[in-house]
């Protein structure tokens, strides 16, 4: 598989570990390393990578700001790295648009597993055939992976799309959070509901869905 990866990491040893693992797993891959936020944004614009590994603590702008700016124009999968194992940092990264989050130091096999999961989510939809689904004024086309709200296209990341797709496929049903985590993220994420909470908030924001009076996504506590 040919893949273009951008690694934004100011610690050379960490960047080399990531690059080595990627090249070993995907021999034809092109890996670009940036050591500052400014360089990361420039390389992103020039290289148009398929995947971004982004360190939180870099020379300015930091990883959070780089993630925010990338999300203004792109839905590319983003994995963020940090030395801080805090829920607040994790939630902030996900709310800014990151798809996943990994704490340093990390096992390179776990890193590769997460990158594979990101590429898998980005590369294909859940098995729904080519059907078109409509919920109120929301339309999801499973064949083209297009989502429209009142006729206007809604730009979603691959993970946001897969979550919405699963919800639409079971419209009217209450789905356990463990089921959604396994279906959208994978079995290794079942014990971490923070992913689901943040991505539901992201979907609601993009759909203009009021959490107090939801039209599309309702939360049943305890499910």
Language-model regions, residue ranges each:
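Two-component/phosphorelay signaling modules centered on CheY-like receiver
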Residues: 11-32
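DNA-binding patch around the recognition helix
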Residues: 130, 155, 198-200, 204-223
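Short, Lys/Arg-enriched segments at the junction into DNA-binding effector domains
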Residues: 4, 117-174, 178
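Acidic, metal-coordinating helix/loop segments flanking the phosphotransfer/catalytic sites
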Residues: 33-51
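Hydrophobic residue at a beta-alpha junction
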Residues: 35, 58-61, 88
């Amino acid at each position: 598989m040919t893949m273009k990866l951008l690694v934004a990491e100011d610690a050379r040893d960490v960047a080399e570990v990531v690059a080595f693992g990627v090249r070993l797993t995907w021999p034809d891959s092109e890996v670009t390393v940036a050591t500052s936020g400014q360089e990361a944004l420039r390389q992103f614009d020039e290289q148009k990578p398929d995947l971004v590994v982004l360190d939180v603590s870099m020379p300015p702008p930091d990883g959070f700001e780089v993630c925010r700016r990338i999300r203004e124009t792109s839905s590319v999968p983003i994995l963020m790295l940090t030395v801080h194992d805090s829920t607040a940092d994790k939630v902030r990264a996900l709310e800014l648009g990151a798809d996943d989050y990994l704490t340093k130091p990390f096992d390179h096999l776990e890193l590769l597993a997460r990158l594979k999961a990101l590429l898998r989510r980005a590369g294909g939809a859940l098995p729904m055939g080519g059907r078109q689904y409509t919920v109120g004024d929301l339309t999801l086309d499973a064949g083209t992976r297009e989502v429209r709200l009142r006729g206007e296209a809604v730009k979603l990341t691959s993970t946001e799309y897969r979550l919405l797709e699963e919800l639409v496929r079971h419209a009217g049903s209450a789905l356990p959070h463990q089921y959604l985590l396994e279906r959208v993220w994978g079995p290794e994420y079942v014990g971490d509901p923070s992913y689901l909470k943040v991505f539901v908030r992201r979907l609601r924001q993009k759909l203009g869905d009021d959490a107090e009076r939801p039209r599309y996504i309702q939360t049943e506590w305890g499910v």
